[in-house]
Amino acid sequence: EPSQAQTWTAEERGILRSLWIGSLPPLTADPSNRVADNAKAAKLGHKLFFDKRFSGNKEIACSSCHQPEKGFADGLPLAQGMGAVPRHAPTIIGTAYSPWFFWDGRKDSQWSQALGPMESPVEHGGTRTQLTKILFSDPDYSKSYGEIFGTLPDTTDESRFPNIAAPIDVPLSRAAWDAMKTADRKIVSRIYSNIGKAIAAYERLIIPGPSRFDGYVEAVLNGDQAVQKRLFNDDEIGGLSLFIGKGNCTQCHNGPLLTNNDFHNTGLTPRTDAPGNVGRAAGIKSVRKDEFNCLGQFSDAEDAVCGELKFAKVSGIELIGSFKTPTLRNLGKTAPYMHEGQLSTLSAVVEFYNRAPKAKIGHSELKPLRLTKTELVRLERFLMTLDGPLIGPQALMSPPR
């Protein structure tokens, strides 16, 4: 009965408060990135994020797949870079709060994540020597880099720094990289890591602001009936009640960003038979070997603060076929859904969770919900109340002028 749905119990009000954007703590420092909160670095990162020159064909920027007007995603089931990317591009909004990056958690910082696509043949298709040369050839970039990180090394000498070289699975790039002197490789990788650190300083500012849901929760916490009635209709109240109750959604989608930042197997059928389908089981192995991880030589962190990496679970059946829980904020802008964009609408998503099919890989953690059609509609209507503005500096939320 909708009229009674207005009276939330003390326990329910506690849950609502925990999901409210007002409960989002200030961002903690990223010890692995000493320029994470440097305004000059964020400004440089903003330019780099939208710059298409940092790609093999000069046509792909970070913003190609993370478009501000599409909730910093791309509206496609699978991302499209220089080739077809086997994953759905997730939003960047609020990811600064996450300890893991990519759907399989194969990176452990925002800055190391930013480096992955740049050298992926199907994404930016670049190489780190090429990127350092672009930086050096642009007086504005050279100057900004110098102010933030110290003088940008000159990498124009092709005998020392081949135009296309990187430690990646592309034979020519790999051979050119292997032929370089160790000291020169370190110079290039240091500049490359700093490119990532500047981009991360920018991405840290992309934080969600209050949605209609947050206004409703605030009204509930203040006991303001009139505002509650104005902001949420009976369907939305019913959907919220299901979300925190028998829908079981908050088991994974909890906290003010509506994600536990963990990895779960939900039994989605993969699009193709690919090794990446094992998800977190492969991601954790990757991140432990990554030269740009928290413990690596390019990280600014003391080893003692790299607890997430050191103590992460590395094996177990629950990692197989598990992918990262995404935030539910701004869902209205970020369709299609899931790690391979398998579900194109929110109604398809709630129906999928209602059915909870058996997993083809590993074991699904879901149990059928047995919600009625009306309940599913209500749940979907509630999920549409989670869109809100971004609270970062507005000039940085669109391409540089």
Locate the predicted segments by residue.
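Periplasmic c-type cytochrome electron-transfer domains
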Residues: 1-401
